[in-house]
UniProtKB/Swiss-Prot annotation:
GO terms for biological process: translation. This is Glutamyl-tRNA(Gln) amidotransferase subunit A. It holds the Pfam family Amidase. Signal peptide: none annotated.
């Protein structure tokens, strides 16, 4: 029996009433995963033995009636450390790496008695926008298996969209939660920088990375964020902010809420069908009582260039630790220490990772630092100031999540610049450290279209309020792909 159509609260009621046990729910989830895995390829590791053991222990202890997450399975992106469970970052470099500690986000999930069911596929070291750079497999879109799921958290998005799991965790450095959420018609949120601990997240861009939740609905997404968020002494970038319940404003009306619509987000490079969907969503918000006005974010057009200098520079530094000495892959044919370094990194990293390491090393090198990295930091400040000016007068910003719907497999993975431009609407949010959500807002040629809502720092509750108001008066989130059991 499958329980993938039940909300978290419905599952909780069944568990508390003992209509099902945690073991039965875990077994049913494992069956859902296996039944769909060949079609979509969401997972790198299915932690069957560990999950069933954890579920049995929970049944023996008893489900906590006051903890809605008790006994709920959770899929985790494979760059988030899980003690005793392979954590590969989808790279040959870490093909055999089992961490000896849990990421704080995972530890928080365990504290709420959630069941870690497996590790999801991703772009290698989170570098990509299509989940095609993984060393292990290419994940496929839940709605059309000839198309990409987005990236880099593609596996976490398809796992939810295809009905394998109800909840999953991803990470977002330049759009890696929101873009795959949009491509697969699910809800994905990138929290404020510092709202969720990065301890245990395999670093890509340290000033940009954030762990965040995927779910089929806004409320369930907020419930999962409530579990993983919070201040953490183990993370020096963790913010001293504690929100007790991110669902607190869900259900409140949005009359009088001021929402900005940047003209740059509907300009050059945006598919006309995406633009049409977003403008229709804006009108829907007006019907709900919100005030929609056009604004300008003039420096957002530089976001992609700024991002790829800063993110690649940080990656070139972060990835120096992978050298074949301490853990992970080591080249077998090396004859000296230098040979180990060179051959291990040449053979262990994929092409996209090596491309970004080289770009970052160049940007940080003597003679080019001021021209590239320093200049990128200055323009980043201008992007931040643009957002601050808008948020002085508006509660939220509305726009498309991605400039197109999901593109076909093997079309952009050989064109790095085109792939990078797919993130042009999500990147500025990371550069400014802001929270943003992608919610289902319609379809273009049968493929899901995501609507992005951006807020000032620590405004996740308001973002959820607006997103839930839209969701409650539309049915896009209820439409499911055939693999889930839907009509499309």
């Amino acid at each position: 029996m499958s329980f993938n159509h039940h909300t978290i609260e419905e599952l909780h009621e069944l568990l508390v009433a003992k209509d099902i046990s945690a073991v039965e729910l875990t077994k049913a989830t494992l069956e859902d995963i296996k039944a769909r895995e060949e079609a979509v390829g969401s997972f790198i590791t299915i932690a069957e033995e560990a999950a069933l053991k954890q579920a049995a222990a929970l049944d023996a202890k008893g489900i906590d009636p006051d903890n809605v997450m008790s006994g709920i399975p959770l899929a985790v992106k494979d760059n988030i450390s899980t003690k005793g469970i392979l954590t590969t970052a989808a790279s040959k470099m870490l093909y055999n790496y089992e961490p000896i500690f849990d990421a704080t986000a995972v530890a928080n999930a365990y504290d709420k008695d959630m069941i870690i069911i497996g590790k999801t596929n991703m772009d290698e070291f989170a570098m990509g926008g299509s989940t095609e750079t993984s060393y292990f497999k290419k994940t496929k879109n839940a709605w059309d298996r000839s198309r990409v799921p987005g990236g880099s958290s593609g596996g976490s998005a398809t796992a939810v969209a295809s009905g394998q799991v109800r909840l999953s965790l991803g990470s977002d450095t330049g759009g890696s939660i929101r873009q795959p959420a949009a491509f697969n018609g699910v809800v994905g949120l990138k929290p404020t920088y510092g709202a969720v601990s990065r301890y245990g997240l395999i670093a890509f861009g340290s000033s940009l990375d954030q762990i965040g939740p995927f779910a089929p609905t806004v409320r369930e997404n907020a419930q999962l964020l409530t579990v993983i968020a919070g201040s953490d002494r183990k993370d020096s970038t963790s913010a001293p902010v504690q929100i007790a319940d991110y669902t607190s404003k869900i259900g409140q009306d949005i009359k009088g809420m001021k929402i900005a619509l940047p003209k740059e987000y509907l300009g050059e490079g945006i598919d006309p069908k995406i633009k049409e969907t977003v403008l229709a969503a804006a009108k829907h918000f007006e019907k709900l009582g919100a005030i929609i006005e056009e604004v300008s974010l003039p420096h957002s057009k530089y976001g992609v260039a700024v991002y790829y200098i800063i993110a690649s520079s940080e990656a070139s530094s972060n990835l120096q630790r992978f050298d074949g000495i301490r853990y992970g892959f080591r080249a077998a044919d090396a004859k000296s220490l230098e040979d180990i370094y060179v051959k291990t990194r040449s053979q262990g990293f994929g092409d996209e990772v090596k491309r970004r390491i080289m770009l970052g090393t160049f940007s940080l090198s003597s003679g080019y630092y001021d021209a590239y990295f320093k200049k990128a930091g200055q323009v980043r400040t201008l992007i931040i100031q643009d957002f601050e000016k808008v948020f002085a007068d508006y509660d939220l910003i509305l726009g498309p999540t991605a400039p197109t719907a999901a593109f076909e497999l093997d079309t952009l993975n050989h064109d790095p610049v085109a792939m990078y431009l797919a993130d042009l609407l999500t990147i500025p949010v990371n550069l400014a450290g802001l929270p943003a959500i992608s919610i289902p807002a319609g379809f273009a040629d049968g493929l899901p279209v995501g609507l992005q809502l951006i807020g000032p720092k620590y405004s996740e509750e308001v973002i959820y309020q607006a997103a839930a108001a839209f969701e409650a008066t539309t049915d896009y989130h209820k439409q499911q792909p055939m693999i889930f059991g839907g009509d499309s």
